[in-house]
């Protein structure tokens, strides 16, 4: 009898151990915005941004793709600027192409972060408050509409995630070559993880960004909001000029697939880029005048120091300004439509450096 009891106790212990292991390996449901995605399922909903005096509020559509096994939480955000269409369309596709049953971890998708700008087709700024959403993070609960959108994204998405990709393209007036920003002002381990994520995304031109704020309360930019909270962050650019071209959309899809493979959230995906072009010193070139812009340089063009990038005229055609590159480098984007206001960007130039170790001289 004693032997039988011992065997039974041993069997019960084994069963409990196996149940414990299975529980440790099981994915949990994910709930946010009033919807729940069980393991191995997809769920979609909307965050509500309540109205305040001066605006009607808005909604932020999102999807949860919850895998069957535990793993990272990757947040993908599109539509921070409303006329940046390829990121929005790429995430529409990814919502249905990512199979949650073959996924480890969770993918959180923000389909259109800036719905007011998207519906009103406004570049740069929100139509109700004139603010650039990607300059007001982490946001304010009692602020203007852009502030409140940023606060919801910070609280509901960024703070839930382990990795964040803010997916952009050139705005409706911008023509650009694909590239990404790698922020190095975060903690060394976070910066290294973010670098590996940039390589995994696969865009071969990577700007080494050394000027982002380090305070979580003054993070300003969406991806930097993740980094100041100890999470890997990345900003990528693919497409522009209000276009919906297949190449720009597919490039984003491939990039996300590469990151999912890198994070071991999926078994398959593209290899990381191995021959990156690292870009160090950079400058956004701006107009000193309001008038008409005539771009001369093109995205992807290598230019010498002093090369002509653009001209600005008044509304009668009289030349007001010639804008030149301050150094030899590569043109990453130009504003490609005629309207230009004083102080607005006309182009972005960056200088090639030897590798990711580059830092500005102090």
Regions found by a protein language model. Give the residues of each.
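Bacterial N-terminal signal peptides
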Residues: 10-20
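Structured catalytic-domain cores with a bias toward divalent-metal coordination
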Residues: 2-5, 24-362
């Amino acid at each position: 009898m004693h032997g039988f009891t011992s065997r039974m106790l041993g069997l019960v212990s084994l069963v409990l151990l196996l149940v414990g292991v299975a529980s440790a390996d099981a994915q949990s449901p994910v709930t946010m915005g009033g919807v729940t995605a069980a393991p191995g399922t997809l769920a979609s909903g909307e965050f509500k941004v309540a109205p305040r005096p001066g605006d009607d509020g808005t909604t932020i559509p999102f999807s949860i793709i919850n895998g069957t096994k535990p793993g990272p939480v990757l947040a993908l955000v599109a539509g921070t600027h409303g006329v940046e269409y390829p990121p929005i369309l790429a995430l529409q596709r990814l919502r249905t192409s990512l199979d949650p049953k073959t996924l480890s971890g969770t993918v959180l998708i923000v389909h259109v972060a800036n719905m007011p700008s998207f519906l009103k087709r406004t570049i740069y700024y929100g139509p109700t408050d004139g603010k650039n959403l990607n300059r007001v993070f982490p946001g304010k609960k009692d602020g203007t509409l852009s502030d409140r959108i940023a606060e919801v994204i910070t609280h509901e998405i960024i703070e839930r995630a382990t990795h964040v990709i803010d997916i952009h393209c050139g705005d409706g007036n911008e023509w650009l070559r694909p590239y990404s920003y790698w922020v190095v002002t975060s903690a060394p381990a976070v910066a290294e993880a973010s670098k590996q994520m940039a390589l995994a995304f696969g865009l071969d031109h990577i700007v080494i960004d050394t000027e982002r704020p380090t305070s979580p309360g003054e993070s300003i930019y969406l991806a930097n909001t993740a980094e100041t909270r100890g999470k890997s962050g990345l900003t990528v650019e693919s497409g522009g000029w209000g276009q919906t071209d297949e190449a720009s959309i597919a490039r984003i899809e491939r990039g996300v697939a590469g990151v999912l493979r890198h994070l071991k959230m999926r078994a398959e995906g593209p290899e990381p880029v191995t021959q990156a072009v690292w870009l160090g010193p950079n400058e956004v070139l701006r107009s000193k005048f309001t008038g008409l812009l005539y771009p001369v340089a093109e995205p992807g063009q290598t230019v010498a120091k002093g090369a002509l990038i653009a001209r600005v005229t008044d509304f009668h055609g009289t030349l007001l300004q010639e804008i030149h590159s301050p150094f030899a480098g590569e043109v990453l984007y130009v504003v490609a439509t005629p309207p230009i206001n004083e102080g607005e960007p006309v182009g972005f130039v960056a200088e090639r450096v030897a590798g990711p170790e580059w830092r500005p001289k102090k």
